[in-house]
């Protein structure tokens, strides 16, 4: 209540008077699910939508990360902790279903043995199995499954060997994060281009390296186009992003206000670490140091249901979940570092975050602290 009559055309300063968010419930487009393995065919039906990209990791066992998507097909697996190319595993993700997915009997996703049977899957909604995209200069067919409203697309293509070829991403805005993996032929790393990496530099999802300058081996070029990304520099190296005749998949993300955020912060080596504003209560936070070596670290609000969020998995290793590494408070409007890990004094870190709930807005209940 006001002591005096407020001037016309003004509202009180509160979350209810923020504009209505385009995405009122983050779980409509991104959701985390947990389960206990059964060693038998296992339908997971709690995602809330039919996922187009599912990333699975065993929590209490040292198994490879399993990444599958609707464009390549459910049984086609790649691993974030490895440079191996795509392989078929009919007993991992068997199908994408109306409200989730069905698992087979692979121990990587569905072991029933006590002490090795806890799993997590992170799920994103794109645009189904995809369609042909002709926005770029690549001469071969490009397939894109895009959800511009949620800032996410899956892109597959066969390389044509042309240096600096461009490939359509279907987002309609400049991406903030692009992650690329070779699917066929010889092994090759996961190239990552984040909007806060220096110009001409990439980082690797399956390694601990600092950001690295692009070489004749290629990579992903700077992010500056609302229609395409660039396969930079190389055409012949087995590890690049456009070697002739080899298949590739690329996951592209753009910022959506109140739903996704991509940025950077500087560490202070304190349990009273930096606060990072996102504009929402995060469901999922991924962090990586860029000025020196260091593992990727991933926390979410499902595995850590209260603060601090310290149930950590590492995309670049097959190791099990750790509770003695990174510690992060997931707040109503962002996150705060609560340990020296991912928070070295003066060090630079990039992050990606997806929302559990927007901070507030017209017709939306305000996000609360955990």
Residue ranges: model-predicted function:
Residues 1-370:
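Surface-exposed molecular-recognition determinants
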């Amino acid at each position: 209540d006001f002591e005096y009559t407020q001037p016309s055309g003004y509202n009180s300063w509160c979350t209810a008077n923020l504009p209505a968010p385009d995405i009122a419930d983050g779980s409509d487009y991104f959701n985390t699910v947990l389960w206990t393995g059964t060693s038998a065919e296992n339908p997971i039906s709690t995602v809330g939508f039919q996922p187009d990209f599912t990333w699975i990791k065993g929590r209490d066992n040292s198994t490879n990360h399993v990444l599958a998507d609707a464009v390549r097909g459910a049984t086609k697996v790649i691993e974030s902790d490895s440079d191996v190319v795509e392989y078929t595993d009919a007993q991992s993700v068997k199908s994408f279903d109306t409200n989730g997915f069905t698992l087979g009997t692979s121990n990587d996703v569905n072991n029933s043995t006590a002490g090795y049977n806890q799993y997590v899957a992170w799920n994103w909604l794109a645009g189904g199995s995809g369609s042909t995209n002709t926005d770029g200069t690549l001469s071969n067919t490009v397939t894109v499954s895009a959800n511009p409203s949620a800032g996410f697309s899956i892109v597959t293509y066969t390389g044509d060997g042309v240096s600096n070829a461009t490939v359509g991403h279907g987002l309609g805005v400049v991406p903030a994060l692009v992650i690329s993996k070779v699917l066929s032929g010889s092994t090759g790393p996961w190239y990552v281009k984040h909007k806060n990496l220096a110009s001409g530099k990439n980082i690797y999802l399956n390694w601990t390296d600092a950001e690295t300058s692009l070489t004749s081996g290629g990579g992903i070029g700077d992010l500056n186009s609302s229609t395409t990304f660039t396969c930079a520099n190389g055409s012949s190296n087995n590890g690049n992003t456009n070697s002739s005749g080899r298949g590739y998949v690329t996951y592209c993300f753009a910022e959506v206000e109140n739903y996704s955020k991509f940025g950077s912060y500087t560490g202070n080596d304190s349990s009273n670490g930096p606060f990072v504003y996102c504009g929402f209560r995060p469901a999922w936070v991924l962090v990586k140091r860029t000025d020196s070596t260091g593992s990727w670290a991933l926390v979410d609000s499902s595995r850590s249901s209260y603060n601090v969020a310290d149930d950590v998995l590492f995309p670049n290793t097959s190791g099990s979940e750790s509770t003695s590494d990174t510690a992060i408070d997931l707040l109503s409007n962002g996150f705060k570092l609560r340990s020296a890990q991912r928070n070295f004094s003066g060090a630079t870190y990039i992050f990606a975050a997806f929302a559990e709930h927007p901070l507030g807005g017209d017709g939306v209940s305000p996000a609360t602290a955990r």
